[in-house]
Amino acid sequence: RLREIILKRAWSEKRKALTSTFDGHELDASMLLVEPLGFLEADDPRFRMTVEAIGKDLKRGDFLFRYVVADDFGRPETAFTICTFWYIDALVALGRGEEGRALFETMLARGNKHGLLSEDIAMATGELWGNYPQTYSLVGLINSAIKLSVSWEVAS
């Protein structure tokens, strides 16, 4: 029952995507997690449309905002690093692995000389911002690397 309510009230026909709030129209990159959390299957058209809407609305160059609406700190100015990894994972789930891999390689290049990433990345410069090193960002990198990797069966 709860799933039905969420799908009815969080889906925006206007945006053709799952939104950040019930009966709302604003996008949030956290909706990229509906597939890995098992809420929607990768072949569900609502997942594909949500990924496409988020890519169109929240992606700037190689990075993603989590959302673009003002919060307690104002309008976001930097990309939330883990969101780009969530997007990479969504691309892989949709069968767009080459696109995901290219973006993953770009993100790898953003790490410092030790391969560490920060919480945020400045959109214009690629400079690391925010909490550093950021566990969320590094876990996102690891998860994406696993999703992009060839299985042991295929590799052997």
Regions flagged by a language model, labelled:
Residues 1-81, 102-155:
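Extended glycan-interaction surfaces of carbohydrate-active proteins
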Residues 82-86:
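Functionally critical, mid-to-C-terminal surface segments that flank or help form catalytic/ligand
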